[in-house]
């Protein structure tokens, strides 16, 4: 599955540079594709292929399922990222933020 390949690549890169990464994190309202934590930020990432709704579907899912809520009590800034990926393996096409 193409989304899984992208998730593996991204998590490997984030781990390699020393960031804390959680893949397919379960919360009460669903499963977050990836959570990446730095000393100042928490990035909540949803990955969608272009042929599966892309950026707008990813950003919408973060908002609709309230993926940012479990992290709001943390002192760090929480940023939702909806990431659109090419379904033919050509890379990241677009991204947007979710509040």
Q: Language-model segments: which ranges?
A:
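Conserved catalytic cores of phosphodiester-cleaving nucleases, focusing on short active-site segments
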Residues: 10, 34-36, 40-51, 65
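Structural beta-strand/beta-sheet cores of well-ordered domains, especially the beta-sheet scaffolds
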Residues: 30-32, 43, 76, 81
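Metal-dependent nuclease catalytic cores in nucleic-acid-processing enzymes
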Residues: 11-19, 61-81
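Short conserved micro-motifs at the rims of enzyme active sites and ligand-binding pockets
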Residues: 46, 56, 92-95
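A short, highly charged nucleic-acid-interacting micro-segment common to nuclease
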Residues: 1-6
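Active-site metal-binding core of divalent-cation-utilizing nuclease and nuclease-like domains
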Residues: 13-39
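Active-site-adjacent loop/helix micro-motif of nuclease/hydrolase catalytic cores
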Residues: 51-62
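Domain-level recognition of nuclease-like catalytic cores that cleave nucleotide substrates
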Residues: 70, 74-99
């Amino acid at each position: 599955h193409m989304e899984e390949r992208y998730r593996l690549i991204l998590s490997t890169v984030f781990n390699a540079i020393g960031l804390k990464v959680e893949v397919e994190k379960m919360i009460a309202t669903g499963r977050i594709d990836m959570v990446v934590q730095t000393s100042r930020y928490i990035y909540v990432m949803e990955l969608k292929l272009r042929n599966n709704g892309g950026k707008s579907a990813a950003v919408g899912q973060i908002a609709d399922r309230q993926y940012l809520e479990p992290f709001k009590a943390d002192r760090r800034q929480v940023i939702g990222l909806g990431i659109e990926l090419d379904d033919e393996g050509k890379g990241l096409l677009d991204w947007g933020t979710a509040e």
